[in-house]
Amino acid sequence: MSATKNPVLITGGAGFIGSNLADRLASDGHDVLIFDALRRPGVERNLRWLQARHPSRISAVTADLRDEQALADAAKDAKAVFHLAAQVAVTTSMVDPIDDFEVNIRGTLSLLEAVRRHGQRQGRRTPVIFASTNKVYGDLADVPLELVDDAYAPVDPAIRAHGVSEARPLDFHTPYGCSKGAADQYVLDYARSFDLPTAVLRMSCIYGPRQMGTEDQGWVAHFLIRALNGEPITIYGDGRQVRDVLFAADTVQAYVSAWERIEQVKGRAFNLGGGAANAISLRQLIAHIEYLMGRKVEVSYGDWRAGDQRYYVSDTRAARHALGLAEPTDWKRGVALLAEWLRAEKSGRPEAAPTVEAA
């Protein structure tokens, strides 16, 4: 447990986004308490990296979201909470929906209650910023699409120009979509019902350094790592599905801005991604990887996954305005930077990896 009186608590803080956020906050002079079960590949390495960079700023608790007492103890003195820990794989939720429920819904509710009760006793209102997902909008099957340059694109010119906005009705698909969607709504309702300063960021596809490349940790890094290792890539679907991608440093800036502006944005949900300018198909990403590597990549195709969207691009206008966000990193530059970082990690020279600030 942290010896610091009022740390920033990051659940899932040893993960990809969490470790980038922890690094930024510690660099800004905040003490950070990481709450993480350390079950996913690579997270122990992220934690060691953080503790080596910030030995006096980073402390950690190894525990599961389902451990209510450990969660309550971690939240007790926090001056802010970034809730990133979750069961994140649609495929895993299909195999064990109850485990998915316990982690994503019960764990989130336990955290909210711990923050609320400690706040009542101590006479303070602790901000909670929650990492949600674009999956809360369902499979978007009602959005007419057409093929444009070997990628799906909406027929509706407004959606094509800007993406999917927060006005889109929620439509939970798969156990994962249901659990994250319910957690999303609980976080928002605690602002309405209990005046807890909360905000929700519904993330699209995030990529960047400290992403370890398993499929559920992000397909951009997964594709890059397999390509760098000379291994084949499997695409589920036809590869024409489109997502907007956002670089890690830009994502971290959005979380920090949400905390800094929490009184202005409390009770609101924002779509967070690279937006229409950074919308790419899986095939387009592979073509760019081949360009960066100077050789072809072996690709095979599997069946579509349950609930997979043919098209999802975030309309980021609300987030950019409310959070004061700059234009994000161009995806081609970001993918090249991630490839450089992965090469440095693979060579055992992490100090050679690039350090990138938000665009």
Regions picked out by a protein language model, each given a short descriptive name:
Residues L140-H162, P175, Q185-W259, A277, ...:
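NAD(P)-dependent short-chain dehydrogenase/reductase
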Residues A70, A80, D99, R106, ...:
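Residue-level recognition of oxygen-bearing side chains
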Residues L21, S27, S59, A63, ...:
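C-terminal substrate-binding subdomain of Rossmann-fold SDR/epimerase-dehydratase oxidoreductases
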Residues M1-S204:
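N-terminal Rossmann-like NAD(P)+-binding domain of SDR-like oxidoreductases, especially those catalyzing
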Residues T11, E102-I105, Y176-G177, G213, ...:
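Short, solvent-exposed loop/helix junctions and linker helices
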Residues N46, A89, D216-W219, F223, ...:
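Activation loop
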Residues R39, R66, A89, D100, ...:
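Glycine-/small-residue-rich active-site loops that bind phosphorylated ligands and cofactors
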Residues E44-L47, D184, A221, R283, ...:
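Short, surface-exposed alpha-helical segments at coil->helix boundaries
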